């Protein structure tokens, strides 16, 4: 730049000044456009206009079971909170594999969500070849609740405790049938773990969900089975079945007079439990995942919701997506070891 007589810098003028102004204008215009675009995108992402249409909950078991009951309760509350219908779509079969595969292949837009159990996500991978990867193909939203199983027997079966059941099975090898909500589920594993630990011979009969399995138990088609405490409680109270044990390491506060299987001599350390989890297709917008998690957690800890389900022995969890992802990885290792040690295989 040329200097004036007083030594100060003279500004450009004429063509130079016009060119400089044009460049500055273009730069400012571009900056403004970028700013508007970025701020607009950020505003859209932050607001997440979700949901703006009905949401479908894929439940991996038949209507009437614990997973279905819990999913419908959450769906009702989400519908109330968001003003959009949350529709439960039961896709039973393959111990949850059919429904899980639907969600794994669904668009990651937040409108197809999986409600399932640990059987589908952390047990099935050790027992059969799956069309989905439990870690790679899903975005964990929240582990919503955990609960023990209850060992139920048909009231005509002359046993009132696990030791008596084992004694009967030993006296009549192969004569007793036990049901489950599907091969490879926690109820199936519970039966196989008991079979291995107690060295007894009994036959596993899998069904497509807890509801049809319970029908079989009530009709006497099977003599006993492990059932989630949520599903079992009303049947126990009605006297239609007899509870002889719970599957946790300790007794459940909901059934304080029912011993744990682990109290049985020779079965110390016995434990099989159930959790309900919410997952979405992989690569879903993290803000949508967080919105779904946040609203679900609010529902789980509403006094009305807790008062309805915690007396049944259902423990609300409401874990974050990151916590749930860690639980899945941990439980994949845990159940892999259990299945290998007990040499459990699907029929």
Language-model segments: residues:
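N-terminal (or domain-start) structured segment
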Residues: 44-136, 175-177, 183, 199-223, ...
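An extracytoplasmic/periplasmic, membrane-proximal ligand-sensing/linker region
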Residues: 8, 17-20, 52-54, 197, ...
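Short, low-complexity disordered leader/linker segments with a strong preference
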Residues: 1-52, 163, 347
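A ligand-binding cleft/hinge motif common to bilobed small-molecule-binding domains
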Residues: 120-129, 188, 193-197, 224-258
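Extracytoplasmic/secreted proteins, especially bacterial periplasmic and envelope-associated proteins
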Residues: 69, 73, 77, 98, ...
């Amino acid at each position: 730049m040329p200097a004036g007589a007083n030594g100060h810098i003279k500004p450009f003028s004429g063509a130079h000044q016009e060119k400089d102004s044009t460049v500055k204008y273009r730069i400012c215009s571009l900056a403004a456009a970028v700013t508007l675009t970025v701020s607009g995108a950020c505003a859209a992402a932050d607001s997440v206009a979700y949901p703006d249409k009905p949401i479908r909950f894929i439940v991996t078991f038949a209507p009437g079971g614990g997973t279905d009951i819990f999913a419908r309760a959450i769906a009702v509350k989400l519908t109330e909170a968001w003003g959009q219908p949350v529709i439960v779509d039961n896709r039973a079969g393959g111990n949850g594999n059919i429904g899980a595969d639907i969600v794994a292949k669904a668009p990651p837009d937040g409108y197809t969500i999986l409600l399932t159990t640990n059987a589908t996500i952390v047990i099935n991978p050790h027992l059969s070849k799956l069309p989905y990867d439990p870690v790679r193909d899903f975005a964990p939203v929240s582990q919503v609740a955990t609960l023990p199983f209850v060992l139920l027997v048909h009231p005509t079966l002359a046993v009132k405790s696990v030791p008596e059941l084992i004694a009967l099975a030993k006296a009549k090898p192969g004569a007793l049938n036990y049901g489950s909500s599907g091969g490879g589920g926690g109820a199936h594993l519970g039966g196989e773990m008991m079979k291995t630990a107690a060295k007894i011979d009994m036959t596993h009969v899998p069904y497509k969900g807890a509801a049809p399995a319970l029908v079989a138990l009530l009709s006497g088609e099977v003599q006993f089975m492990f059932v989630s405490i949520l599903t079992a409680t009303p049947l126990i109270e009605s006297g239609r079945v007899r509870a002889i044990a719970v599957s946790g390491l300790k007794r459940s506060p909901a059934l304080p007079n029912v011993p744990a299987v682990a109290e049985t001599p020779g079965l110390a350390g016995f434990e099989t439990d159930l959790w309900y989890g919410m997952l979405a297709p992989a690569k879903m917008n993290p803000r949508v995942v967080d919105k779904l998690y946040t609203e679900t957690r609010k529902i789980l800890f509403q006094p009305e919701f807790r008062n309805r389900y915690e007396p049944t022995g259902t423990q609300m969890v409401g874990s974050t997506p990151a916590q749930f992802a860690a639980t899945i990885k941990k439980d994949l290792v845990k159940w892999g070891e259990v299945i290998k040690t007990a040499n459990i295989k699907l029929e």
